[in-house]
Regions:
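NTP-binding/hydrolysis catalytic cores, primarily Walker-type P-loop NTPases
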Residues: 198-251
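Short amphipathic alpha-helical segment that frequently serves as the phosphate-/nucleotide-binding helix
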Residues: 18-23, 133-137
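Glycine-rich phosphate-binding P-loop
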Residues: 8-22
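Amphipathic coiled-coil/heptad-repeat helices and related helical stalk/stem segments
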Residues: 21, 67-71, 132
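Rossmann-fold NAD(P)-dependent oxidoreductase module
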Residues: 27
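Conserved catalytic-core segment of NTP-binding enzymes
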Residues: 95-199
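Nucleotide-state-sensitive switch-loop elements of NTP-binding domains
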Residues: 2-7, 30, 34-94
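Charge-biased, low-complexity intrinsically disordered regions
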Residues: 24, 178, 228-229
Length: 251
């Protein structure tokens, strides 16, 4: 997984992108990688607020408008570093980012430079279900158009229930099955159906704490820490499945 870049992209806001980005960063740190993190969200820079992850806040707005030119430094860094790079992008950044990537053939540029790009996106149930699914479709279309080696990791956020499409679970949909060469895997973030788990994770996210900080904090009791560890360890286990071969090869 060295020399890889990870963009978290979804056009629908409030679906858990920053949580996914922070969990992903912690996963790679736990697995022993050097990680560089960045946040491009001009509206709600939640990822940037995780101080322990040393996230860089990238300026992409000029005169109150997102400027594609300001994406240049980000992708130049992705092309030049050997670190595992994780970039969280806000909902308002989704369309400008996709246009920049397509206009500048960035998927091919990264591939030609020997980099492996993973795009992470979030799928949910509830009112945002169709919007998040459409976002996944757009990402796959972009990758197909450029015929690159870019892979997609789908985070299935089950907070609003398990998403079902025309009676089928996500992994049985035509979009997933028909694009198995692009889909690296699905990482479920399960709903524990417990107000205790929900409250604990909410407290962690509102304080912008990492799992390691929670373990050392006196603000969480032993049982709460156990619940929080279970949530993150389950996600790490799912990511091991998603990236299994690559992680093993690095070891």
């Amino acid at each position: 997984m060295k020399n890889t870049s990870h963009l978290v992209l979804q056009g629908k806001g409030g679906v858990g992108k920053s949580f996914s980005a922070s969990a992903l960063a912690q996963y790679f740190i736990e697995r022993g990688y050097n990680v560089a993190c960045a946040d491009t969200d001009p509206v709600n820079s939640s990822f940037y607020q995780f101080a322990a992850l040393n996230v860089s806040l990238l300026k992409i707005m000029e005169g109150g408008v997102i400027s594609q030119k300001l994406f240049d430094p980000l992708f130049e860094e992705l092309l030049s570093t050997d670190d595992v790079c994780i970039v969280d992008n806000g909902a308002s950044t989704f369309i400008p980012m996709l246009k920049f990537i397509s206009d500048n053939c960035m998927l091919s540029a990264l591939q030609d430079a020997g980099k492996q790009l993973y795009i992470h996106t979030v799928i949910t149930a509830g009112q945002a279900k169709d919007d998040t699914f459409n976002g996944l479709e757009r990402l796959i279309e972009m990758i197909r158009a450029e015929q690159s080696n870019t892979k997609v990791v789908v985070w299935q956020n089950e907070f609003w229930g398990v998403p079902v499409f025309d009676g089928k679970p996500l992994d049985k949909t035509e979009l997933i099955l028909g694009n198995s060469d692009i889909i690296q895997g699905i990482c479920p973030v399960i709903d524990r159906n417990s107000d205790a788990f929900t409250a604990d994770i909410r407290n962690v996210l509102e304080a912008h704490l990492t799992l390691q900080e929670v373990k050392q904090s006196e603000d969480f009791g032993v049982i709460a820490k156990s619940r929080i560890c279970r949530v993150y360890n389950d996600i790490f286990t799912e990511l091991d499945k998603v990236f299994g071969r690559e992680v093993i090869d690095d070891e």
